[in-house]
Amino acid sequence: MSATVEFARMNGLGNKILVVDMRGRPDKVTPAAAVALNADPQTEFDQIMAIHDPKADGTDAFIDILNSDGSKAQACGNGTRCVVQALAAETGRKAFTFQTVAGILNAVEHEDGTISVDMGRPVFDWNRIPLAEEFHDTSRIELQIGPIDNPVLHSPSAMSMGNPHAIFWVDRDVMSYDLARFGPLLENHPMFPERANITLAQVTSPTSMTTRTWERGAGLTLACGSAACSAAVSAARTGRTGRKVTINVASAKPPATLSIEWRERDDHVIMTGPAEWEWSGSLDPSTGLWSRDGTQEAGAR
């Protein structure tokens, strides 16, 4: 078995993704390799999407997802779109079914190059998100940061899209908040026993909103698909918008929009957006040592 595997540097709305082909191998991308790859500016990433042979009948692959700190992630919508684009280019197919630790994802590439991912049903039960305290209604939980009489952020909506999310509703530009300061405090708040993705959301119309996310295990990120889905669902759930919205991702290079629909007929959340290939190479999944195709560049030694 070769020590190296093929990988592609891709992005979904700027969300930095490494798609790693682990098919035909029993091993996995190690946390140490992930940390080494993220330490190199050329391979710095938000998520690794490792494609493994399918484990379940009717699926095309099992996707193992790692954060930039080496921890496991249950879901990554932007990364899933990148996997679809890579496999569509390889096979000529347009529709795929993936298994992750969070469940089954169905995805399709459209003629215009955008990709839709069925992210499944949202979860609202406090003990399944999970939260450390019982809440009958998780559309507004008791949590704030800042002075008691004048909090900077407060009363988020909490839910899971396969991973825990807290959506804080704000009434001014999401980029005006010091999320680099507040993000780690909220991600690791005792309310979230498995940590959480933290999103600031500003509703701009009944069909549009703007978001910015501190991603669990990755930090400030240009985009987060599952966070966009969670913001859209939470906005509809609290009556701020309808069930179909356009998400403007504030931290990504414009135009940076995702279309999110929380389907009424089956409660599934459908995310549609772009994916972009940047370059390819090979890497050692145990150490993170890598080289770029067509060059002598190498890193993560």
UniProtKB/Swiss-Prot annotation:
| Any GO BP annotation | lysine biosynthetic process via diaminopimelate
Marked site, Could be important to modulate the pK values of the two catalytic cysteine residues, at: H165, E215
Query: In terms of domain of life, where is this protein from?
Result: Bacteria
Known EC number(s)? 5.1.1.7
Report which reactions are catalysed by this protein.
Answer: (2S,6S)-2,6-diaminopimelate = meso-2,6-diaminopimelate
Which compartments does it reside in?
A: Cytoplasm
Pathway-wise, it operates in: Amino-acid biosynthesis; L-lysine biosynthesis via DAP pathway; DL-2,6-diaminopimelate from LL-2,6-diaminopimelate: step 1/1
> Quaternary structure per UniProt?
Homodimer.
HAMAP family linked to this entry: DAP_epimerase
According to UniProt, the name of this protein is Diaminopimelate epimerase
Q: Which organism is it from?
A: Rhizobium leguminosarum bv. trifolii (strain WSM2304)
